[in-house]
Structures are given as structure tokens and as C-alpha cells.
């Protein structure tokens, strides 16, 4: 086998394969509840838009430098969770509720362009069209520059749990994710 073939096989094997219903949730839900731990260990959650990148084995989230508590919590303690529990506007019929537990990192860099992860912003503008309009307005960008200076958070799942029909009274299905590669 050629070197290119081996590289291709490695790329394929790195992908996180989840059941189709779970994949639909990751791609279809508008937001998730992103939970971090405060300095004293108290969990705190925020609604955030996510981008699922199975080939990269991660979720991408962003926050403004003006709302940086999420990133500061991640820098101190990278243990996080993403709960996909609200299917509003997803178009999905009877989706499962999905909990992702994992490790987050927030590189210590501020991005000034909304196109660092272009597919994230394409998704955001698709589900929040008014955001695209405001982002294109130079006056808005000037007055709200703090909002457009972004910190990126990358979450690598270690465990994924899902409850068919979002029935939390039932035992969840579970997928352990290895961190090989």
C-alpha cells in the first residue's frame, strides 16, 4: 500500500462515528447547553451554537472576549459537557436528548475575523440570519467590536450518552470515545 493510502486510512479511522440519530442532533439542533466548572467546582451552563467536526474529533464553540467567563473556566479546568436537549427549530421528529462529556481547550488567542472557522459562521448565519445582516454593517461592527473579537473553544468528546425520545427516565445509551490519534 502506498503512503497516501495509509494516510487516508488514518484519516478515516480518526473520525468519531455516532449513530445517525445522534449525528442528526449534532447537526440539526440550534444550540446546546455548554457547561463548565467555576473556580469552586460549581457547574454553570450557557446556551451556545456548536459546530460538530467528526473528522477532527471535536466540537467548535466560540465566545466573545466581552463574555469570556466560559473560556476562563475552560483554561482552569477543561472538563466540560454539552447537552443537546431542546430541538426547537431543528426540524427533527422525536430526537434523542444527547449529553457529550469531554475535554475542552481554549488556545490563548483572540480571533478578529469571523471566518477563522468559516463553516461555524456559515452555520451561525444560516440559523440566525439577522446576525449575518448585523455582521455586514460596518457601524455595528465598530460599535460592537468587542463582540466580534472571538475566543474559540474546542471540545473533544470522551463519552456520549443519549436518551431516545429525550426520555430521561430511561437508562441512556452510551458511547465511550477513545482519544487515539
Each model region followed by its residue ranges:
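Charged, gly/pro-rich active-site loop segments
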Residues: 2-16, 91-181
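Short, conserved active-site entrance elements at the starts or edges of catalytic domains
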Residues: 7-31, 35-36
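Structured helix-beta-strand junction loops
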Residues: 28-29, 76-77, 149
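Short beta-strand segments
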Residues: 29-66, 72, 81-85, 96
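Structural motif
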Residues: 56-58, 79, 103, 159
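Short acidic (Asp/Glu) patches
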Residues: 64-68, 78-87, 130-140
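Short, surface-exposed beta-strand-loop junctions and turns on beta-sheet-rich folds
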Residues: 67-69, 169-170
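Residue-level signal for well-ordered alpha-helical positions
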Residues: 73-77, 166
